[in-house]
């Protein structure tokens, strides 16, 4: 019976990861505001941050990496898909560890914690892409790309904190956690 419960828990995590990857891809490709620098602002990072809050590091990283890399492919930026996979996966892992380490039961502190985790994840994003562009295009090319990434980061932090607050008040995190981990608690 324990293996069935563990398998169900793993299946639910896999399903939530797949749904998260699809939402990340959709939010990245549909909700776009083009920037003059050639990049664009989107809601994808918000869902990466939420995936990092709800899923384990491995499942959150896979959802973030796959969803974002697919979005790059669909939008015609396939050359960036591998680095996007790595950067976005690291973002989700960053969010997971910050939210789990500093987790408290009071809502205002949870929201502040989510804002800190979001900001840290976006620092990972800006730094990751800067490093990549520095290797490929040199310092000038990397510097030219930073502005768009910072705008994306600021937007993502603000939007993800608003979405996180809504999900916290509506108990959606508790609901998702109960579904994903309900059998795991009894299986241990």
Roles of regions detected by a PLM:
Residues 1-188:
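Loop-helix junctions at membrane interfaces
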């Amino acid at each position: 019976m324990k293996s069935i419960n563990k398998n169900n828990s793993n299946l639910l995590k896999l399903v939530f990861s797949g749904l998260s990857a699809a939402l990340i891809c959709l939010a990245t490709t549909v909700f776009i505001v083009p920037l003059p620098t050639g990049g664009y602002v989107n809601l994808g990072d918000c869902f990466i941050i939420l995936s990092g809050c709800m899923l384990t590091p491995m499942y959150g990283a896979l959802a973030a990496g796959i969803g974002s890399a697919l979005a790059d492919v669909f939008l015609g930026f396939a050359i960036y898909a591998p680095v996007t996979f790595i950067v976005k996966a690291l973002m989700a892992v960053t969010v997971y560890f910050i939210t789990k380490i500093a987790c408290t039961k009071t809502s205002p502190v949870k929201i502040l914690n989510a804002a800190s985790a979001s900001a840290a994840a976006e620092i990972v994003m800006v730094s990751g892409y800067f490093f990549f562009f520095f290797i490929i295009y040199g310092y000038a090319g990397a510097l030219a790309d930073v502005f768009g990434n910072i705008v994306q980061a600021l937007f993502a932090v603000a939007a993800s904190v608003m979405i996180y607050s809504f999900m916290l008040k509506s108990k959606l995190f508790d609901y998702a956690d109960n579904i994903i981990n309900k059998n795991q608690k009894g299986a241990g």
